[in-house]
Amino acid sequence: MISEKAATALATIATVCWCVQLIPQIIYNWKKKDCTGLPPLMMFLWVVSGIPFAIYFCVSKGNVILQVQPHLFMFFCSISFVQSCYYPPISMARSKIVMIVAAIIAADVGMEVGFILWLRPLYEKGVKWPDLIFGISASVLLAVGLLPPYFELAKRKGRVIGINFAFLFIDSLGAWLSIISVILGNMDIMGIILYSIVAGMELGIFASHFIWWCRFRFLAKGNTFDEESGQAQKEEPDEKIEQDISKSDRNVTNYNLDNCSIPDDASSFADDFNIYDSTDGGTLSRAQTLHAVHGVVVRTDPDRYSRLSV
């Protein structure tokens, strides 16, 4: 052990980070009212990982902070999980969300009470391997929960959508501080490996977005980007578009033709549809129908065809 005081201080800071890291994400979701890019599976796995974490620290009789931390972590993860299910693109029914949360709470209470009462006497007798299994399984669930965001990154060429970077930074900071505290403390190799997996996967998310930014945002000047797909689109000023439309309007000519002069286009490019008259804002009557022929909108009156400016 290099420095017990330094290890304890760093572990405490890391624990605090892992208590509050999801608050920025929750606020971010609430403001956007949209969780596109934040996989519900990620939050669900993190909620479930809190159960074995709580059992592990309660059985080993860790300090109060370590026993409270998994429960706070589960609480904030549950809020974010509910948001990811309720907001688009999932938009799950409230009744279904309530049933899922109730099942998680029931499983949490049952497992914690049962395993803590069963394993604590064994731990006091020196049988520690059952408790260690819970600690390892919790860390594995936490790391596996970081896999779904990579599928979201693949959909958008590496761009991070829906994940708040403040949340990601605080969570990564907790992992790195935990690694340093273990190195300065008892040099638990298993702990270093598990914390390193979490830190490495979160670093990969940062790196993915940075690479996307270098490829598309920084190098492709004069382009705009779709928020969902991340596809680059040419940027055109609104004034130029308006000028082009006005020029096009000046070239439009109205024609009064007989019904028999223009044969009906029965191809797949022609279609009848309802629309409001652009001149007076009123709805077209039954005698006035619209017909689209290869992208040209014409208005049919009983005695004439005329092209509309749209």
From Swiss-Prot:
Domain of life, source organism: Eukaryota
Cell location: Cell membrane
A GO-annotated cellular component: membrane
Cytoplasmic side: 1-6, 58-61, 118-131, 186-191
Topological domain ranges for the Extracellular compartment: 28-36, 83-96, 153-164, 213-310
Keywords per UniProt: Cell membrane, Glycoprotein, Membrane, Phosphoprotein, Repeat, Transmembrane, Transmembrane helix
Modified residues (Phosphoserine): 229
Positions glycosylated per UniProt: 251, 259
Pfam families per UniProt: PQ-loop (PF04193)
Topology class, membrane: Multi-pass membrane protein
Transmembrane segments: 7-27, 37-57, 62-82, 97-117, 132-152, 165-185, 192-212
PQ-loop domain location: 5-69, 138-194
InterPro entries listed in its UniProt record: LAAT-1, PQ-loop_rpt
Name under which the protein is recorded: Uncharacterized membrane protein YDR090C
Organism: Saccharomyces cerevisiae (strain ATCC 204508 / S288c) (Baker's yeast)
Lineage: Eukaryota, Fungi, Dikarya, Ascomycota, Saccharomycotina
